[in-house]
Amino acid sequence: MTIDINAIREALPHRYPMLLVDRVLEVSEDEITAIKNVTINEPFFNGHFPQYPVMPGVLIMEALAQTAGVLELSKPENKGKLVFYAGMDKVKFKKQVVPGDQLVMTAKFVKRRGTIAVVEAKAEVDGKLAASGTLTFAIGS
């Protein structure tokens, strides 16, 4: 099942320039795969870096968090709630992400306890790992 941008906007509170998920390709109960098309028109490229544009690693992690957020906030019991970062562990950046790349982002929920969830996430470009990490979230109202 795919999820288009309209359903993503319904699930997430983020808007331009902070909405970093373009489409969901696959979704199951605890796993989601989505894409972010990276273009030279992204506002962060104006300063990171003008002569050598590279997507900031923290924004790759934010895109992964939003990917997980789409899955969690699409559930009826979480409709209208917010998801907040509670932590990031084992974050690694392996490949620069540049204009023209398509980030393929996967997030798998590995632990849930009350309003806290732990996700294993990774972002790839052309089948090569760009970034990965363990993300912890708190689901709030």
Swiss-Prot record:
Q: Which InterPro entries match?
A: FabA_FabZ, FabZ, HotDog_dom_sf
- SUPFAM superfamilies in the record: Thioesterase/thiol ester dehydrase-isomerase (SSF54637)
- Enumerate the HAMAP family for this protein: FabZ
Q: Example GO biological process term?
A: fatty acid biosynthetic process
* Gene Ontology MF terms: (3R)-hydroxyacyl-[acyl-carrier-protein] dehydratase activity
Output the Pfam families linked to this UniProt entry.
Answer: FabA
**Keyword annotations for this protein?**
Cytoplasm, Lipid A biosynthesis, Lipid biosynthesis, Lipid metabolism, Lyase
**One CC-aspect GO term:** cytoplasm
**Taxonomic source organism:** Streptococcus thermophilus (strain ATCC BAA-250 / LMG 18311)
Query: What the protein does?
Result: Involved in unsaturated fatty acids biosynthesis. Catalyzes the dehydration of short chain beta-hydroxyacyl-ACPs and long chain saturated and unsaturated beta-hydroxyacyl-ACPs.
Catalytic residues at: 48
Q: Which CDD domains match?
A: FabZ (cd01288)
Q: Does Transmembrane helix count among this protein's keywords?
A: no
Catalysis performed (reactions)? a (3R)-hydroxyacyl-[ACP] = a (2E)-enoyl-[ACP] + H2O
Question: What does the UniProt entry say about where the protein is found?
Answer: Cytoplasm
Q: What class of enzyme is it?
A: lyase
Signal peptide start-end? none
Spell out the protein name for this chain.
3-hydroxyacyl-[acyl-carrier-protein] dehydratase FabZ
| Documented EC number(s) | 4.2.1.59
Q: Which NCBIfam families match?
A: fabZ, PRK00006.1
